[in-house]
Amino acid sequence: MEQQLSTENNQLSSEEILGLLPHRFPFALIDRVIEHVPGKKAVALKNVTINEPQFQGHFPERPLMPGVLIVEAMAQVGGIIVTQMPDLPKGLFVFAGINNVKFRRPVVPGDQLVITCELLSIKRQRFGKVKGEAHVDGKLVCSGELMFSLVD
């Protein structure tokens, strides 16, 4: 996936995101990128709807977005940063680990996650670390550090 950001205002549509990330339904979790500084930072939106498959079982009487999917959405925003770095080798960067992740509030259908990720480090052009935060209505719902690795 070698597409470079082409919009003047540093936003990406869902179609452009599909050109950058390998994720597809039901794991394409980013709806739109609303701010992007290539190689440094990205801010994206995830609209949480009752139609998502996880809500059939998590939990039918009180649907809550699973924390692992919030973290995965943050990782995908981090992936947007990594895919836009021209000095890195092309290939598949995968989620390799998490540190200090905290869940602070539930996320429910009807919420809009505003996810911000900032690049913390890149090592040997193969490993990366980003700081991620997810907010709903201006309130922090999840934060942590996410690691990436290039798969040969």
UniProtKB/Swiss-Prot annotation:
Keywords, in A-Z order: Cytoplasm, Lipid A biosynthesis, Lipid biosynthesis, Lipid metabolism, Lyase
Catalytic activity: a (3R)-hydroxyacyl-[ACP] = a (2E)-enoyl-[ACP] + H2O
PANTHER family tied to this protein: 3-HYDROXYACYL-[ACYL-CARRIER-PROTEIN] DEHYDRATASE
Principal place of residence: cytoplasm
Function: Involved in unsaturated fatty acids biosynthesis. Catalyzes the dehydration of short chain beta-hydroxyacyl-ACPs and long chain saturated and unsaturated beta-hydroxyacyl-ACPs.
Family, as annotated: Belongs to the thioester dehydratase family. FabZ subfamily.
GO annotation terms (biological process): fatty acid biosynthetic process; lipid A biosynthetic process
Enzyme's top EC category: lyase
GO cellular component: cytoplasm; membrane
Top-level taxonomy: Bacteria, Bacillati, Cyanobacteriota, Cyanophyceae, Synechococcales
Pfam families in the record: FabA
Any one Gene Ontology molecular-function term assigned to this protein's record: (3R)-hydroxyacyl-[acyl-carrier-protein] dehydratase activity
Protein name: 3-hydroxyacyl-[acyl-carrier-protein] dehydratase FabZ
Active-site residue numbers: H58
